[in-house]
Amino acid sequence: MKGLKNQIMKKTSLFICTLLFISSIVFHPKITFAYPFWAQQNYESPREATGKIVCANCHLAQMPTIAEVPQSVGADSVFKAVVKIPYKNDLKEIGADGSEVPLQVGAVVMLPDGFKLAPQERWTEEIKKETEGVYFTNYSEEKDNIIVVGPLPGDTNKEIVFPVLSPDPSTNKEYHYGKYSLHIGGNRGRGQVYPTGDKSNNVVFTSSSSGTINSIETIEDGSYKVNIEKENGEITTEAVPVGPQLIVKAQDKINAGDPLTNDPNVGGFGQLDAEVVLQSPYRVIGLIAFFIGVGLTQILLVLKKKQVEKVQAAEGI
């Protein structure tokens, strides 16, 4: 009964997210998206066999992502995995309609099997305050160890706190104490390529052929058509959407691959790996006992040395 209830809640959450996504596009087209939604729809796992997180397939620019994870944690305990997505304050980028919009951010944390998002009833007051306004989702119903966040307003969410619950090997023999790896990705801004392979307007547009620019047509929506005349007299047309700025003019000679526009992108994606040790309480107790033993041994050696010195002094040695 509990499992059925959880499934219903997950499906309801996914449905609500989808509605929010669609309504955002329809009613707020100027917003710039850093949606993990696309990866969830197109990839079974967000991490390829090569180790690359799939967000990098659409977000081609690289920018740093920083993660802070405890060196070790106890079993069945809640800890914080902090993802930092740095960029300059008040940075703007080109939206889908060509207007300037604030950057948004998104992040994905791939936890080891058995680790998962901590239930809210176990969040501390500090965690509740740090995660206010942040909505966490699982990558899929089958993968509750992969947590996705975003899109969020970037200027107020450059640091995202993920509350994580560790497994308890004493109650579940599938998990073991030891060192585990986490895979983390953070993104700011729009991608350069859509999952379909089509370019967004947040990328450099280049010429597909060599020749002379015959003419440039400005379309009503603000986009352009660049007509290039090849050496054989054939005319090819390059479509440039609204947003990027042209850096060429009529009668310019260009080669295939030369840029026609500036690079409007100011965002980027970054990923990294981190490690955490699931610490056995018995190991901690053993370590404490070891240190106590070492301390007692040193004390006994000092006492023995003093005793020997007293005997030697009494015997006149």
From Swiss-Prot:
One of its GO terms (biological process) is photosynthesis. Binds 1 heme group covalently. The chain crosses the membrane at residues 284-304. GO terms for cellular component: plasma membrane-derived thylakoid membrane. It holds the Pfam family Apocytochr_F_N. The 4 large subunits of the cytochrome b6-f complex are cytochrome b6, subunit IV (17 kDa polypeptide, PetD), cytochrome f and the Rieske protein, while the 4 small subunits are PetG, PetL, PetM and PetN. The complex functions as a dimer. This is Cytochrome f. It comes from Prochlorococcus marinus (strain MIT 9301). Its cofactor is heme. Heme binds at residues 35, 55, 58-59. The lineage of its organism: Bacteria, Bacillati, Cyanobacteriota, Cyanophyceae, Synechococcales. It is a single-pass membrane protein. One of its GO terms (molecular function) is heme binding.
